């Protein structure tokens, strides 16, 4: 087992690991002390560890996206756990999922467990089903805290469905295209005309990163948000992503959308983007069903 960090949480984690019979418990530090048997992050990659537990604040809100260990180079990993609970999935957890690690879990459930057992202590009574209580509270918190992001082709109904769904779920509605316009002071066609698609995508990624790390939101995303890999990573760190799948013949041509100015352009765009949309885990068959 590898434990990242050398603070108080490391000490607790190490004690539990040894108590549960871990064959080896190795400590990883940015400034390793060889006399204490500590490893650098570079050395840790070749440790042969089966389990990694992060006890550092790396990747914690608001400094999301930080990851010190390259888990993709550790093929024997069976589990990665991160004590950080905000965002729901740190960069470490996202990378572990991408690397196919069987178990990759953030720290929210641990936070809830601490609260449940602290409540038992202070109230001087035991819950009838502490484990079940932890699971129920964790699920309720996750439903409340996580974002819902809607993706799909231009004019697929993301804004319309998004506003209705935000009201239903009690989440704040955010239209990322509107936020781009608000921040830049120009319309989307004007941004395209002045800076091209690359310029627009950079602004889109900046607004995605800004809002995706927050919580309790319904995010209506631009149709091309899936063209930048970092956008999907940002959306997944703190939410569920839904694809609104509207039939091609029901989509609107033009309407101030620079990349869908003709039927042929729309068909070509749909052919290019559909495989990217379908890579996601959650799909809504149609805006009406959503």
Regions found by a protein language model. Give the residues of each.
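A glycine- and Lys/Arg-enriched "phosphate-lid" helix/loop adjacent to the NTP-binding pocket
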Residues: 237-276
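Rossmann-like adenosine-cofactor binding region
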Residues: 36-104, 225-231
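Glycine-rich adenosine-cofactor-binding loop
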Residues: 1-17, 152-154
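Conserved lysine of the Walker
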Residues: 158
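ATP-dependent small-molecule kinase phosphotransfer cores
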Residues: 178-236
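Conserved small/polar residues in nucleotide/adenosyl-binding loops
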Residues: 282-287
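Adenosine-phosphate binding glycine-rich loop
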Residues: 83-145
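NAD(P)-binding Rossmann-fold cofactor-contacting core
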Residues: 20-35
């Amino acid at each position: 087992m590898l434990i990242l960090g050398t603070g108080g949480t490391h000490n607790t984690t190490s004690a539990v690991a040894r108590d549960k019979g871990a064959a080896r418990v190795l400590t990883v530090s940015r400034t390793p002390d060889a006399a204490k048997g500590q490893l650098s992050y570079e050395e840790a990659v070749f440790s042969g560890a089966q389990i990694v537990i992060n006890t550092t604040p790396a990747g914690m809100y608001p400094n999301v996206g930080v990851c010190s260990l390259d888990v993709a180079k550790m093929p024997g990993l069976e589990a990665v756990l991160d004590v950080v609970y905000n965002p729901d999935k740190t960069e470490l957890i996202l990378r572990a999922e991408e690397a196919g690690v069987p178990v990759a879990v953030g720290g929210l459930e641990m936070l809830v467990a601490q609260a449940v057992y602290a409540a038992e202590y202070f109230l001087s009574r035991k819950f009838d089903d502490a484990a079940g209580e932890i699971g129920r509270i964790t699920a309720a918190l996750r439903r409340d805290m996580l974002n819902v992001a809607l993706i799909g082709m231009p004019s697929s109904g993301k804004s319309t469905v998004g506003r209705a769904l935000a009201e239903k779920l009690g989440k704040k509605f955010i239209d990322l295209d509107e936020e781009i316009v608000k921040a830049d002071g120009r319309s989307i066609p004007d941004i395209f005309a002045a800076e091209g698609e690359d310029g627009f995508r950079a602004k889109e990624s900046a607004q995605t990163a800004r809002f995706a790390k927050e919580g309790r939101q319904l995010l209506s995303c631009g149709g091309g948000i899936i063209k930048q890999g970092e956008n999907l990573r940002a959306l997944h760190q703190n939410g569920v992503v839904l694809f609104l799948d509207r039939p091609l013949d029901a989509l609107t041509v033009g309407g101030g959308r620079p990349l869908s100015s003709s039927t042929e352009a729309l068909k070509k765009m749909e052919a290019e983007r559909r495989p990217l949309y379908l890579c996601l885990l959650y799909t809504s068959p149609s805006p009406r069903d959503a």
